[in-house]
Amino acid sequence: MPKANRRAFLRGAGVSLVVPPFLSLTRSANAASSLSSAAHPATTATGAPLRMAFMSIPNGVQQDHWFPTNSEDGIALSPTLEPLAKVKGKIQVIGGLDHVHATAGNDGAGDHARANATFLTGARARKTAGKDIHVGISVDQVAAQRVGAATRFQSLELSSDAVRNSGSCDSGYACAYQYNLSWSSPTTPVTPEPNPRLVFERLFGAGEHGQRQKNFDLRQQSNRSVLDFVLEDAKELARALSSEDRIKLEEYVSSVRQIEERIKSAERFGLVPDPNLPTPDGVPIDFGNHIDLNLDLMLLAFQTDSTRIASLLIAYDGSNRTFPDLGIIEGHHYLTHNQRVPELAKKVALIDRFYMQRFANFLEKMDKVRDVDGNTMLHNSMIVYGGAIADGNRHTHANLPVVLAGAGGGTLKTGRFVDAKQKPMSNLFVEMLNRFGVEATSFGDSNGGLSEIG
């Protein structure tokens, strides 16, 4: 095995498995350089990697079930937020943030596409169904372009929904607006990857694209795991680790194997697909499993320091997906426009909670992973969950549903509800960029920062 460095690899035929940087091997080899890097971007004051991620939910939320209150012991969680109970001391729920460029203005209908495009850009999307799309660079890509060279991948873009970059999708708005969160320039969306298998191969397959495909085919033919090809390197590495970190290595290897097995299973089995939502080959049919796999892959990418910036389109805005496992046969978008009927409003709240449960599971896993500085990965992260529509019935874009998880390496005050009092959502992004080590005086339609979060 090569001499230890910050990104040690377990290597085998067609496989390159990154070793998490928190292992004692990399910690001892890089303690001085790591702890002296506190002034570097995307790094905490202790020298650990600082991560940033963004996740979008569609169609707003059921207002009566979303917003919490503050109590003597922190956040008093609302019904939708109850899945966050185990990590409620490590999050902030932010109210009072607005996205004015998601409103109709002079552009008329098309709130869902417009909101999706505005969420991470803070910019107004040009109303067009043609190739002359124009919105703004997204906050994740501002960060990626400044600090992305520090990791194998500048950023990671994932989707649990379809991918569409051509045609008209919402009242004269191009599909690119509705199906992409990340934009590397005002005219260039960064297409997310919806196939967990391809994400897995990108993270752990060796070689260039064509060679990775050949290596994958070889493993499929022999019915072997990626881990089977690196066992000797793993044994050699384990001998160099402390007993505590050998356990961490075993846990990491086990998590990789479990995800690989879940991907294989998802490729073979699943629920009957929604007839209105054709599923591309290789994408899990079970929607909840698809979201969970994407979040677990994001966790592995962070854990191995393959990237420090990620985004996940949980579902495109305007999604009319049904949820038969929840006993919901009506489409989500339809339900949001019929919330005057109490029983239908309850179904919207159930869908909101379904999404929140996936997010909560992810945060709990992050909170169990120890980072190179001894803190948890969640402590050393800033994770935004929300959307650019507040009330899906009236298509409002003020007082948006936003959760900010993680302590940003100790720079954020968690365990509370914060009222931003009608500030642009872009102010939050300015604040996050600066705490990420990317100097920013403005972003999108910001009019300052959001010091309230710290």
Where are these regions (language model features)?
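Ligand-binding pockets and gating/stacking loops
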Residues: 1-454
